[in-house]
Amino acid sequence: MTNFKFTLLARSIAFALNASTAYAAQPTNQPTNQPTNQPTNQPTNQPTNQPTNQDSNLSEQLEQINVSGSTETINVKEKKVGETQISAKKLAKQQASDSRDLVRYETGITVVETGRTGASGYAVRGVDENRVGIMVDGLRQAETLSSQGFKELFEGYGNFNNTRNNIEIENVKTATITKGADSLKSGSGALGGSVIFETKDARDYLIDKDYYVSYKRGYQTMNNQNLKTLTLAGRSKKFDILVVDTTRDGHEIENYDYKIYPNKQADLSAVGPTREKADPYQITRQSTLIKLGFQPNENHRLSVALDDSTLETKGMDLSYAFRPYSQADKEIYGERIINDQSKRKNIQFSYENFSQTPFWDHIKLSYSSQKITNKARSDEYCHQSTCNGVSNPQGLHLVEEKGVYKIVDKDNKDFNYQEDKNNPWSYGKELYNSKNEKISNDVDTEGGALDSVLINCEKLNCEKKKFPIYKEKDEEWKDKYEHEDRDITIKELNGKKYGEISLKKSDSSGFTKYESARFLFPKSFGYSTDFVNDRDLNTNTQQIKLDLDKEFHLWHAQHQLKYGGLYEKTLKSMVNHQYNTAANVQWWADYFFCKKPVNGNRIPAPDHSAYRCKLMNSDIGKDTYLIPVTTKNNVLYFGDNVQLTSWLGLDLNYRYDHVKYLPSYDKNIPVPNGLITGLFKKFKSTDYVYGNKYLVPKGYTNCTYTTDCYKQNFEENLALLLRKTDYKHHSYNLGLNLDPTNWLRVQLKYANGFRAPTSDEIYMTFKHPQFSIQPNTDLKAETSKTKEVAFTFYKNSSYITLNAFQNDYRNFIDLVEVGERPIEEGSVVRYPFHQNQNRDRARVRGIEIASRLEMGDLLEKLQRFPLGYKFTYQKGRIKDNGLHPKYKEFLELNKDEHPEYEAIARKPQPMNALQPTTSVYNIGYDAPSQKWGVDMYITNVAAKKAKDSFNSQWTSMVARKEKIYDTESTVPAKKANGKEVKDSRGLWRNNRYTVIDTIAYWKPIKNLTFTAGVYNLTNKKYLTWDSARSVRHLGTINRVETATGKGLNRLYAPGRNYRMSVQFEF
C-alpha cells in the first residue's frame, strides 16, 4: 500500500514540477519520507523511489542477481540479465555459511581457491580476484597483491595471506552479483563483474513492532563448524538499534576419503606434497555488526554503524614442500605451524534527508573508515621429542624432593660416576644411570659449569631450596666424582629473580683455584629454533560519499534520476617481520640460562641458553618489499532510468573516476636498500660495491653497504621510484528495454569497465641473480566492454530468459621478461629482469539461461511447486599482440628438434578463470501453511576440456634444450600424472560430475524453525575446476607430486555431508 501511495505522490510532484509550481513543505505523514519502520534501501522488488510505471525499473535490473532480505519472489519486470539478487532469507534457507555457498547454486560465477588461505574473491567471465569488484556497504574491499612477480616470488611459499577478505554471511541483507563490466557501481576492478553486499539494518526487522530477538545455532559436518548467532533489534521513540553477533568455530573442510589414514600417528606422519588428507587447521570467525539510528522526524535520519570481524586460521602445513632439514634426525620435511588472520573493521556515519526539493527526493551523506589487515604468520621448527635441538634419550627430568631440586633419569633415579672398565683408553670416570648403563654420550659432562649457568627463579621457586651439583674435582683439584646439595643464592636483575650457585675456591697454594662442578643437562640446546615469518598486508580506506535521487516527468517521459560523487583515500602497505625465537622449549632451557662472559666478566644473559650459551632469540627488525602507496580516488556519477512509453525504456548511466597513486617511504619500515640501489641510476664502473670494505682495489671508490656513496645512490634511485601516477576513466552503462507484447521483454546492454594497476604492479622492485623485477610507472589501465542481448518470455510468475553476451578485455597486465641488464655501469654481472607491461587482449563469448516455472500456472493443484533451471556456457581466449617475449630464447633453442613448440607458443591462450559448462536444476515445495518445505538442487558441471586449459610452466616441463649461464643442455620431459608433458595444456582438470543437495525446513510453532540438509546426497567423488587450477607447479604450498598425481586427493570436494540449524525468534 505504501508503494501505491508513493506512486500517486510521485505523479503529483512530477506534474507540479512540469507546471512550474512551487514546492510546498512536505507533510510529516508522507510515505516517501520513509517512516522509522521502513528501511532506507528497500528490497529490489520494492524500491524506495518506486517508478510510476513498473517497466521503468527494468533496465536497472539488467545483468544483476540480487539477494534481498524480504522476499524470494522475482518480479520479471524488474529482472536484469546476468544479474542475480540473493536474499538473506534465501541464504538462511540454503544454510549458506561462506562465499562458496553464496554462489553454490549460481552459474557463471565461482570462488577462487587458494588452499590454506581459503577463498580469494570470485571468478566471472574469464577473469578473477582483483578483476571482479567486491563491495560491502559501498566500500571496496581489500585487493590482493596481483603482480605476477609477487606471486612468483612470495605467494607460492605461504608467507603472505594474499587473499581478498570475505564477509560474514549472517550480516548480509542483500548480495548483488553482476556479470559483465560493472565499473559504474564498483569503480576500478570490476572488469568481469562485481559482488556487492548490503548489511542488515534494524528497520528490516522492525516493520510492525518495536523489538526483535533471534538466536540461531547451526552445525555442519564437512568442517565440524558450530554456528552461534544472536540478533537483537529494538526501537524506542526516535532511536533504533541492531546488534548481530556471530561466532563460527570449526576446522578444515574434509575432502573425500578424509579418513584415509588409520590413526593419528599415520596422519601426522603423512607430510609433504603427497599427503592425501587436508591439512589440519582450526578455523574461527568472530563477527559483530552494530547499527544505531536516530530519526528525530520523518525527514531526517542520522546513523552510525560498526562492522567488526576477525577470521583466524591456526594449524599445521603438513603438505608443506620444504622444511628445515637440520632440525631433526631424518626429516625430509620439517614442520610449519601457521596462524593466519583476516581482520576487517568499518565505522560508518551517515545522514539522510527525505524532504523533496527540486533537486532531490532523497539525499544521503556518509563517511566511512575501514581497516583491513590480512596477516600470515608461520613458525617453522621441529616440535617433536626426537628433534636434535631437544634430544634427551635418557629422559632426564627435574623433580623436587624435600626442598631439593634433583635431575634424575627416566626411572626417577640418580646418576653415579664409575670407571669405564670396557674402555682402557677412558680418562677419568664416566656417568652411569641406576641400571648401570653408561650415559655419558647422552649427557653434557663438559658444559654446564656452575660459573656459566644461572637458575630462573621466576619459574622455579628458589626460596630455601637446594640443588645437587656434580663435582668432578674439589677446590684443591682432587678427584671427587660425586654430587653435592648446594644452597641457591637469590639475586635480582631488572626486577627479575635468578639463582646462583658459586664455585668453591681455594687460595692455599698462593693462587686461586676453583673446583670443577657443573649441572648435568641433556646434550642438546633444550629448544628448537623457530624461524618466524610474520607478514601483514594492510588496506586502510577513508571515504566520503554523497548520493541523491530524484523522480520526475519531463516531456511525457518518466525519469528516475540518481547522481552523486565520492572521495576515497586508501593506504596500502606491507609489514614484514622475520625473526628467530625458541620453541618446543624443554626444562633445561626454560629453568636455566647462561651467565655470559663479557670483557673478562660474566653477566646474566636470560636470552642465552644454558647449553653452550647460545642466543635463543634474534630479530632483524621490520621491513617491507613494497613501498607504501596512498590511492586517492575522485568520482562523479549520473544515472537516469527513462521510461519513454509503456513499451520503451532507456538506461543512461555514466561515471568518471580519477585515480591518483602517491607513493611514499617509511624509514621505520624500510625497503631493503639492495632492492633499490642501482635500479635506475647505476653505480659507476669505478665504484666498489660488492665485497669486503677493507679490501677496496686501488683506483676504486668504496661504495659498500654502509658508505655515504651507497646511501647517496639509494636516495637518488628512491627519488626516481617515488613517481606519482594517475588514471582517468569514463565508465558508462547503456541499456534499452523493449516490451512489444505482454509476454516478451527484449533487453540490450552496452557497458564498459576498467582496472587501474595495483600499487605493487607499478612500484614493486626486486633484484636477484635468477629473478629481478623492474618497476613500471607507465602502465595503462586494463579495460573491458560488455555487449549483451536478452529475451525474456514470461507469464504470471513463470519465465525463461535467454541471454547472449560478449566481453572484450584490453591492456591485460602481464609480467614480461625484458632481458638481462647490468647492475652497475660496465659490469659483466647481469641480472635477468622482468617488468609488468600491458600486452594481452581477450574475448569471452557465451550464453546463459535462467528460468523458473511455477507449476501452479499450469495446474492449480500444483501451487507452490516451482521448478528452476540455470545454464551457462562460455568460451574465451587471450590473444597476445605478437609472440610473447618469454618464448623467444626457448623457441630459438628448440626450433630444430621441436618445431611444434612455436605453434603452441603463438596460438591464443585459454583462460583458466572460465568455468566449465554448468547447469543447475531446482525443484521445491512450500506447504500452504508455510510450516514446512523442501528444495532439491541438482548441479551438473562438464569436464574442463584440455584445449581450454593452460599450464603457464609448460616451457620448463616439456622435452627441451635450455641455456644456463651460456651452457646449453638437453632436458627430458617431466611427467604429470604418469604421462610426459608435451604441450601447454593444464596438468590437472576436473571430470564431469553431478551433485545433488536436498534441504528442508520445519516450523512447528511460529517462533521456531528447524532447517536440515544433505549435501552431495549420492556421495559423489569430484574435483572442482577451481580446486584443480589452484595446484601450484612452483613454491611450497598447495603442491602435489606432479609425476604421479599423489596428493591431489586432498583437494577433492567433501563427500556426503550434513547441515542443520535451529532458530528461535520473537
UniProtKB/Swiss-Prot annotation:
Residue stretches making up the TBDR plug domain: 66-200
Biased segments, Low complexity type: 26-54
TBDR beta-barrel domain segment(s): 208-1066
Keywords from the named record: Cell outer membrane, Membrane, Receptor, Repeat, Signal, TonB box, Transmembrane, Transmembrane beta strand, Transport
SUPFAM superfamilies listed in its UniProt record: Porins (SSF56935)
Sequence repeat spans: 26-29, 30-33, 34-37, 38-41, 42-45, 46-49, 50-53
GO function terms (MF aspect): siderophore uptake transmembrane transporter activity
Domain of life: Bacteria
Location of region: Disordered: 26-57
Chain intervals for the UniProt region annotation (7 X 4 AA tandem repeats of Q-P-T-N): 26-53
Subcellular location: Cell outer membrane
Residue ranges of the motif TonB box: 63-70
Keyword Metal-binding found: no
Membrane topology: Multi-pass membrane protein
Function: Acts as a receptor for hemoglobin or the hemoglobin/haptoglobin complex of the human host and is required for heme uptake.
Extra remark: This protein is subject to phase-variable expression associated with alteration in the length of the CCAA repeat region. This mechanism is called slipped-strand mispairing. Addition or loss of CCAA repeat units would change the reading frame and result in introduction of stop codons downstream of the repeat region. This may be a mechanism of regulation and a way to avoid the immunological response of the host.
Protein name (record): Hemoglobin and hemoglobin-haptoglobin-binding protein C
Lineage, uppermost ranks: Bacteria, Pseudomonadati, Pseudomonadota, Gammaproteobacteria, Pasteurellales
